[in-house]
Amino acid sequence: MRILLTVLIALLVGVTSAPAQQGQQHLIVTSDALKWVDPPTFPGAKLAIVQGDPSKEGLFVYRVKFPANYKVAPHFHKASENVTVLSGVFFIGMGEKFDQGSGKELPVGGFVSIPPTHRHFAWAGGQETLVQVHGVGPTDITFVNPADDPRKK
């Protein structure tokens, strides 16, 4: 009975994971191959897509370079957001009001995972800060206070 159960589990895993693997290939991206653009949501920062398209279904990865002391007003996303600090220091706070006193410092290697629709804000430390954001799209950004949305200015 145990052998039969083991065989059935192995077959089930093989059958359910095969479609996910079909059509996929590995991806290697070097930092010099990234195309940096001026994102309308973060004026003064730079953004590069590493993989996928955040506005469409599926995995996405992008990087954002923030100048020293850059502030991101309270906002939220319809998908989970996962952020890793690659260089500099990044601060993250939770809530609908920008409050540096309640933020958490994330040094290089620091990570934060933010659930969908969870209000949060962020800022860079005293030097240029590079973060990598990944998740499963589609996602977006909605500023808590519409007046903070740079796309509307």
Spell out what each predicted region is.
Residues 25-27, 101, 121-153:
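Double-stranded beta-helix
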Residues 67-70, 76-97:
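Glycine- and acidic-residue-biased ligand/ion/polar-headgroup-sensing regions
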Residues 1-4:
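Positively charged n-region of N-terminal signal peptides that target proteins for export
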Residues 50, 109, 131:
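Divalent metal-coordination and catalytic microenvironments
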Residues 19-60, 146-153:
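A short, N-terminal "cap"/entry segment at the start of jelly-roll beta-barrel domains
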Residues 72-74, 92-93, 114, 119-125:
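Short beta-strand His + acidic residue motifs that chelate non-heme Fe in jelly-roll/DSBH
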Residues 6-15:
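Bacterial N-terminal signal peptides
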Residues 53-55, 67, 90, 96-117:
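Short acidic-glycine-tyrosine-enriched beta hairpin
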